[in-house]
Amino acid sequence: MAGVNLQLRHAYSIAQFVPTVSSPPPLPTQRVRLGTSPSRVLLCNLRANSAAAPILRTTRRSVIVSASSVSSAVDSDSLVEDRDDVGRIPLLEVRDLRAVIAESRQEILKGVNLVVYEGEVHAVMGKNGSGKSTFSKVLVGHPDYEVTGGSIVFKGQNLLDMEPEDRSLAGLFMSFQSPVEIPGVSNMDFLNMAFNARKRKLGQPELDPIQFYSHLVSKLEVVNMKTDFLNRNVNEGFSGGERKRNEILQLAVLGAELAILDEIDSGLDVDALQDVAKAVNGLLTPKNSVLMITHYQRLLDYIKPTLIHIMENGRIIKTGDNSLAKLLEKEGYKAISG
């Protein structure tokens, strides 16, 4: 692992058999050359500014689910303590989280507090550089960042003690701002391997290709895609809307408990955004949650959040309902800046 860590820090892999990796692809590209066998390692190199996916060492793929809650606008310091959820066990609990860029030691997160319960939808908004995307990357264990303080508990487990792939298999999923292409690997093969990796983790029976196909057809309906989509290579030649729907399809197949959607609305026209939002809403249950990172109010018109959090200078400074986003849209960040 050490030999490929530097170049694969923005990567995920899924493999039935893991061959030796002698020379990882360069960072600037989003394409990766693979062998013709879908059971080979799938090394998907992401651009440096993409959201980090958990690094999956063998037959693993990231799983998603997100959430949190509160009712009216409050200061972030009282967020954890003031919630009226006595007796409820949080899905995700973040306390005083601090993190730096591993290489430069620049501090980005400066005491983030957030509590997410099952069945909630949370949105994190903020200016560029506020720390919101870094927060999502730290949650999934991106190696470019180092946690220097605080705690993250997911489903009662200390997330900071878990490797990125273990976080993924535990039920944490993260979507990409710019989903990568995987030439030579069909969606069907990709999803089947990811699904069975999750099943193995849960100690459940795996599905053969015929059984999996039957399972997958209903998931395609959720994301408004036809069955011939399964024969296409992962994200290759896809439109922006198709790539985002493919991300949601992965979420639907994997059944994660917490989904982190990092700017899933970026680059989408209104029709594509509505399709993606409809798919996300169709996956919400009382047992899973969603954490959305976004710049824009328009996403919140289609996916209604339980709570909205405003980040500034590495901290959540305000939490409230949808009226907070409308105030932001009308008056800008100056109206709520700490």
From Swiss-Prot:
Membrane-spanning residues: none
PROSITE patterns, alphabetized: ABC_TRANSPORTER_1, ABC_TRANSPORTER_2
SMART domains registered for this protein in UniProt: AAA (SM00382)
Entry GO CC: chloroplast; chloroplast stroma; cytosol
Location of the ABC transporter domain: 92-338
UniProt keyword list: ATP-binding, Chloroplast, Nucleotide-binding, Plastid, Transit peptide, Transport
Primary location: plastid
Molecular function via GO: ATP binding; ATP hydrolysis activity; ATPase-coupled transmembrane transporter activity
Classification via InterPro entries: AAA+_ATPase, ABC_transporter-like_ATP-bd, ABC_transporter-like_CS, FeS-cluster_ATPase_SufC, P-loop_NTPase
Name under which the protein is recorded: ABC transporter I family member 6, chloroplastic
